[in-house]
Amino acid sequence: MVTCMDVNNLKLDGMELVAGESGLRRMVSWTYLVQTRPFEEHMNRGNFALIVVDYVRFDFKEVKKAIVELNDLGISGLAISVVDDKEFIPKSIIKKADELSLPLFYVRWKGASFVDISQSIGNLIMETNIMNKRTGDYLYNLLFGYNVNDRYVEKISGQFGLDFS
């Protein structure tokens, strides 16, 4: 399971947590680029939402409405980038994220990319899923395997950092 804390721990260039620290344990299922309403038709619970404030589709007034709606739909966290870094996220939005315990990240416009952020989060989710499957397979083989011997247990346990000696 990947959480917003894991996303924050990636220390992605140009991305910083600005609010909602109390919600960092929210589970992240995937990323979602916020563009089209109604949001519920395009996203799933646990999505990590990404919004670009471009002053055409989204301005900060629209973001303030969207943050409540997206939180009600179960997003895990929210990252906001502002075209050309024209301004920082308003204090009212930061306050709302804190009230909702919604992790809110600021993404620098220049040098940071939603594609890179999405890819990094996706890779983290996939790596975690693979590790969880390997752990599950290992435990299954320990419990129900027909040909489990001490050498197998020692070899596989070492891959998980376990020492049964």
Where are these predicted regions, by residue range?
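Alpha-helical/coil-rich non-catalytic "connector" segments in signaling and regulatory proteins
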Residues: M1-S165
